[in-house]
A protein has these predicted regions:
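Gly/Ala-rich beta-loop-alpha elbow adjacent to hydrolase catalytic centers
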Residues: 114, 118, 123, 127
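Active-site-proximal beta-strand elements of phosphoester/diester hydrolases
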Residues: 209-214
């Protein structure tokens, strides 16, 4: 059986190594790659540079699906807002690349899956906005502390893709201080936390365009491997159609 190729953008950050000064590194946390491979896909990693951005459309043509992984806050100026003081320093090159990959994949009929920041990127790419600092309004700001994942329950909406794959309620590891505010074009909220935060989105049609606000890569078996397997299956079908592969 063909393993579909899944594009993911790398993050750029300062890293330290024993005896060496800090240096900019393009990287992606290994659990994201492990999650894609556990679900049956192969990760294809793209650097968040202007050169890569110029080839974003060609990258999507070469792969079968796109995963937008977690990371720092999306630049608020991308959706027309002034940044909140609590926001991370932006990595605009990654924002631009992931938005381009997302829109090209949607235009090409290829599946898109967003995780945490990735769900927010999908929403922004389709014209939505974000709530920039949840601690300004939610009753439990400790749910989104820096430096740790916090478990909490999310409830899915019956009849949706996340409901079919994950059930009506699940306990998930979460780490974020931003969330979806207004939904992008053609998207609907399909899961919520107890504080009302949108925890999953998907397209209103039958296409596989899904985002989850939590981190399934941290506990795949109980928090999302099945939705990633569905994404990989949809990507494999795309590969079969585009490349003429025979399903076995």
């Amino acid at each position: 059986m063909t393993r579909p190729l899944i594009a993911m953008a790398l993050d750029r950050r300062l890293t330290s190594s024993e005896g060496w000064p800090d240096e900019l590194t393009d990287a992606l946390f290994a659990p994201y790659i492990d999650l894609i491979e556990a679900a049956g896909g192969v990760a294809v990693l793209a650097a968040s540079t202007d050169a890569t951005l110029a080839e974003a459309h060609r990258i999507v043509e070469l792969v079968d699906g796109v995963v937008v992984a977690g990371g720092r806050d999306v630049d608020a100026r991308t959706y027309g807002h002034d940044p909140h003081p609590a926001n991370d320093p932006p990595l605009r090159a990654r924002d631009r690349l992931e938005i381009a990959l997302t829109l090209k994949a949607i235009d090409s009929g290829k599946p898109v899956l967003g995780i945490c920041r990735g769900m927010q990127i999908i929403n922004v790419a389709l014209g939505g906005t974000l709530e920039q600092h949840l601690a300004d309004r939610v009753d439990e700001p400790d749910m989104h502390l820096n430096g740790q994942f916090v478990d909490h329950y999310v409830n899915t909406i019956p009849g949706t893709r996340v409901w079919r794959d994950l059930g009506s309620s699940l306990n998930v590891p979460s780490h974020h201080h931003q969330a979806v505010a207004t939904l992008g074009r053609g998207l609907r909220a399909t899961a919520h936390a107890g504080d009302g935060v949108v925890e999953a989105i998907e397209c209103t049609g039958s296409r596989f365009i899904v985002g989850v606000q939590w981190h399934p890569e941290r506990r795949p078996a109980s928090t999302g491997l099945s939705i990633v397997e569905s994404f990989v299956t949809a990507s494999r079908r795309t590969s079969a159609v585009v490349h003429g592969h025979q399903e076995v």
